[in-house]
């Protein structure tokens, strides 16, 4: 079996190494039947993407983020946050001044990054943002924990938003609450504790899908035997222990536990098991079995999938990218560092479930069983948006939401970058000459000295086109 992808650059092709004649004539291989060999050819028309000339903005309307060395995990998270418009609008409305430096201010660095993602025509650097984190070059070449980065960034923004018009935005978007309870079986005693969360960690191992993980999350544990619960004045009692949800946030972030410690092998391992996640997630299912008695049953907890963050590789390294539906339409986009491409739903969902995949054996002379291989690319984080809140969250963000000083500063930076780019592109058309005029000769040599050399460091320079006629320059 062989294949070739024809393109404008490679429009002619011959399959010179299709199969050795000796193998074709070998009776045990089964290619010749009644002195006849059947050759099957398949032709498909596909859209060829030239990596070097590919323009993400032109093809998709979006631009990517540059990788500083090992910051692809951060890039996928930043793209996900940027494409939550309500969050982006709140970041733009954080108070910053023209005297702030992006490298020393997380809010300004994030505003600058988001502005460039929104208005640039090419990929955007994250160096200002990582400098505002206090990172050096070494940090940029180390992969950090995505969940930890998400929490630290949220905490810092939450703190910076206090006392401003956008105070409480992080909580409004991402904060939910659950109730931890212990209830005695034989006596009337119950202990409860309310806790908040900004994301939920769901088990992958032993769970078929997201619903199975939620079932496990609220699973009731029995406290009995040597593990009885001490119920204050009631002493040791048999009890039930569990968790139920009081409310879910408008933007639900689910961290899938793809990495865990293996006690048998005394090392961290990656769980590549097949794990399914739905396009729509109904957390009111089965009469609200995930909800506590205090939950508001008037709130409809039906969610639609917004982002799928993917890890490709093993426990000690790999690559991160994200599939995102910025407007929750049917069109998915893959954000892979600098490159943004359009993708279909199957690519974003089913192909990120993980597990094993079969490759059928196509050799007609052998009766082989299908070959299975483990898929090391799979989802590790999911972002869902509640249906009843999507019109508020997927809102319009335009220039009026951006501080004037930020627009002016970044527009100047953009113009200066374009000037340097144009100058570099046209550099081969120009040359620098120095011209010693009569005034220079008089000033440097004097009236009575005629043969000493002129100091050309002190005469004016001119940048001229190489093709410019002398008469025009004169």
Segments (PLM) and residue ranges:
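Short, recurring structural edge motifs at helix starts
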Residues: 26, 169-172, 457-463, 474
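Conserved, non-catalytic sequence blocks in retroelement Pol enzymes and Pol-derived host proteins
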Residues: 100-101, 138-145, 173-175
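Active-site nucleophilic cysteine motif
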Residues: 67-80, 141-152, 317-319, 382, ...
